[in-house]
Amino acid sequence: MKIVVDENMPYVEPLFGDLGEIIPVNGRTLTPEQVQDADVLLVRSVTRVNAALLEANQKLKFVGSATIGTDHVDLAYLATRGIVFSNAPGCNATAVGEFAFIAMLELAARFNSPLRGKVVGIVGAGNTGSATAKCLEAFGIKVLLNDPIKEAEGDPRDFVSLETLLQEADIISLHVPITRTGEHKTLHLFDEARLMSLKANIWLINCCRGDVIDNQALIKVKQQRDDLKLVLDVWEGEPNPMPELVPFAEFATPHIAGYSLEGKARGTFMLYQKLCELLAIPATKGLSDLLPRFNIKAVELEQLPDEKALLQLARFVYDLRDDDAVFRNCFAKENGFDIMRKNHKHRREFSALALAYRGQSEVDWLSNLGFSGVGR
């Protein structure tokens, strides 16, 4: 069995090595010739999977995408061919939620404007939006959710209209899929008019898809509104973001919000489980077998952390400032965006860091944030 796999997908060899011949490829430049003999194709969001790519292949059984979204895959075409498809919904949700939360802590520190007391509006209450809300609510932050699709489906959570969210939120975090047509179109959901209407001193964080915000309009608005603070992990025109926009972002990164070691391993592992199910063989490998030990054994707390101390703990796990600095230095270089993604260091999730606390105060909120080992 030939398994063609994006070369940037981690843990493929230990998971799939016993199942067939692994053929690593560049996912962004993948050609029909490279997949014409594949039995299994494993991709990320940079690969367009459609008839043009697969028409020469008559033996493909399974396509797996280690992503939450599926907009890069022609699902209808795969169905007509009888090709089984699986993605990895939620695989990097924790990573994205923690990224957005850390970004808010960093902005709070940079502008001496505490996160506690602010209202955060989350647009899109799926896996990543829910993970962001979980972090915020654990820290005692009021969260407003907007997701008309989930609301219509009967999701029991409380939702508000986008207009209400824009009026009441001090921070907006975007977590919607890209939808180009229809009643709930998200393409340029934040156009020039909507960006100009945002309340004063708003923080806007985009961790979903670059073209949910009209980036050209965002440049124009930022030229007029210095009070609008931006954290951008995604960009229109990836892998070539508009260079004029980068200086306007407080933190800028190359679409790596979901790039935790845990999240990346989880995505590959979910595809391994699905392929084993398709092949009717037992999944003998475990996710816990893949992850290395964290380089900090534990942090002993003499007292529970305030907001500034929490940021220091978060930086033990992930320092957003480092990725921001690398991005500004490299994004304009040839293939810089993709090189940064490929060479992204092994960021961990909060769960990798154990905290030891023996005081009498309530510690559940630290556990709910995801830190491990919290106890009295």
From Swiss-Prot:
Q: Which residues form the active site?
A: R209, E238, H255
Gene Ontology molecular function, alphabetical: 4-phosphoerythronate dehydrogenase activity; NAD binding; protein dimerization activity
Query: Which InterPro entries does its entry note?
Result: D-isomer_2_OHA_DH_cat_dom (IPR006139), D-isomer_DH_CS (IPR029753), D-isomer_DH_NAD-bd (IPR006140), Erythronate-4-P_DHase (IPR020921), Erythronate-4-P_DHase_dimer (IPR024531), NAD(P)-bd_dom_sf (IPR036291), PdxB_dimer_sf (IPR038251)
Identify the enzyme class: oxidoreductase
Entry keyword set: Cytoplasm, NAD, Oxidoreductase, Pyridoxine biosynthesis
What is this enzyme's catalytic activity, as reactions? 4-phospho-D-erythronate + NAD(+) = (R)-3-hydroxy-2-oxo-4-phosphooxybutanoate + NADH + H(+)
Write the Enzyme Commission number(s) for this entry.
1.1.1.290
Pathway assigned in UniProt: Cofactor biosynthesis; pyridoxine 5'-phosphate biosynthesis; pyridoxine 5'-phosphate from D-erythrose 4-phosphate: step 2/5
Q: Which GO terms describe its cellular component?
A: cytosol
Q: What SUPFAM superfamilies does the record tag this protein with?
A: Formate/glycerate dehydrogenase catalytic domain-like (SSF52283), NAD(P)-binding Rossmann-fold domains (SSF51735)
Q: Where in or outside the cell is it found? A: Cytoplasm
> Please, one GO biological process term?
'de novo' pyridoxal 5'-phosphate biosynthetic process
Q: Where does NAD(+) bind?
A: D147, D233, G258
- What PROSITE patterns does UniProt report for this protein, alphabetically? D_2_HYDROXYACID_DH_3 (PS00671)
Instruction: Give the residues the record marks as binding substrate.
Output: S45, T67, Y259
Q: What does this protein do?
A: Catalyzes the oxidation of erythronate-4-phosphate to 3-hydroxy-2-oxo-4-phosphonooxybutanoate.
Q: Which HAMAP family match?
A: PdxB
How this chain assembles, per its entry, is: Homodimer.
Family recorded in the similarity comment: Belongs to the D-isomer specific 2-hydroxyacid dehydrogenase family. PdxB subfamily.
UniProt name for this protein = Erythronate-4-phosphate dehydrogenase
Source organism: Shewanella oneidensis (strain ATCC 700550 / JCM 31522 / CIP 106686 / LMG 19005 / NCIMB 14063 / MR-1)
Gene name in the database record: pdxB
